[in-house]
């Protein structure tokens, strides 16, 4: 079975993604393989929450241009890709890579790598203040909810819809991703000023650049409190995200999401 050595996502025009891949050297015939391309808004494991973009491509092509996202490249809306690699001789299939690839997920230089390594050590130090958090990526594309979606207004009419969790899309949130982060419930005034409007119940969350977060994503802490992402500020090097500083708003305990996500 072929094994990916790289899956790169690039964009040159802001209207499409250029997807290119390469395989680890092998004696197998590459003509015995076909490739399917899958896409999702969340880098969840497995393939069930990914949609197929293209199927039956020759593995020997090594690249594909996804133009179907020409209207879906909104700011703060990352897309994650996997390949389904079919062995035409044995009918076997594997899905790679794990985790999924996305735009600008590579390491630009050694300095970037070292900064991320040190921050990762601090977050995972048992003597530090790093904690486990679960991220529920909000769906912003797919099949509209048949219960609450108003096609004229182009929005949901029920924020408490039990079918779509008030998102307007079926299966409104993806499965959870576990990450390490540091929560600050009493930020300094200089930190608050980065975000503007601030409520007493809001908190800051410091996480690394993966997975990239966007407003309205849901975060669960180790006390089973749910928070919604209000704003995200990033620390970058050479255009690549090192760290995300997230303003979170605490959700009331009677919110429907507590029953649906926890």
Regions found by a protein language model. Name each.
Residues 1-31, 90-109:
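Pro/Thr/Ser/Gly-rich low-complexity, intrinsically disordered linker/stalk tracts
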Residues 104-152:
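Active-site-proximal polar cores
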Residues 218, 225-236:
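Short beta-strand-centered aromatic/proline hotspots
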Residues 32-77, 88-93:
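Recognizes extended acidic, P/S/T-rich segments that occur
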Residues 125-131, 248-262:
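Glycine- and charge-enriched low-complexity intrinsically disordered segments
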Residues 167-202:
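Short beta-strand/loop turn elements enriched in aromatics
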Residues 234-252:
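Short, solvent-exposed secondary-structure boundary/capping segments
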């Amino acid at each position: 079975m072929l094994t990916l050595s790289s899956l790169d996502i690039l964009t040159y025009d802001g209207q499409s993604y250029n997807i290119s891949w390469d395989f680890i050297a092998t004696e197998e015939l590459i003509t015995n393989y076909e490739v399917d391309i899958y896409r999702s808004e969340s880098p969840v494991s497995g393939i069930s929450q990914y949609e197929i973009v293209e199927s039956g491509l020759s593995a020997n092509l090594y690249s594909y241009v996804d133009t179907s996202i020409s209207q879906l490249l909104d700011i703060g809306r990352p897309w994650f890709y996997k390949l389904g690699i079919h062995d035409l001789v044995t009918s076997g299939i594997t899905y790679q890579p794990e985790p999924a690839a996305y735009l600008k997920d590579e390491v630009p230089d050694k300095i970037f790598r070292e900064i991320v390594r040190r921050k990762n050590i601090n977050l995972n130090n048992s003597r530090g203040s790093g904690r486990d958090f679960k991220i529920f990526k909000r769906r912003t594309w797919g099949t509209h909810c048949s219960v609450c979606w108003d096609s004229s207004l182009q929005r949901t009419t029920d924020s408490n819809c039990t079918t779509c969790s008030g998102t307007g899309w079926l299966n409104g949130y993806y499965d959870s991703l576990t990450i390490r982060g540091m929560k600050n419930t009493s930020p300094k005034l200089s930190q608050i000023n980065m975000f503007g409007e601030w409520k007493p119940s809001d908190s800051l969350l410091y996480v690394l650049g993966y997975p990239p977060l966007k407003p309205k994503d849901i975060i669960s802490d180790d006390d089973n409190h749910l928070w919604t992402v209000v704003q995200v500020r990033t620390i970058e090097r050479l255009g690549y995200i090192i760290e995300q500083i997230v303003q979170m708003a605490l959700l009331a305990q009677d919110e429907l999401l507590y029953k649906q996500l926890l």
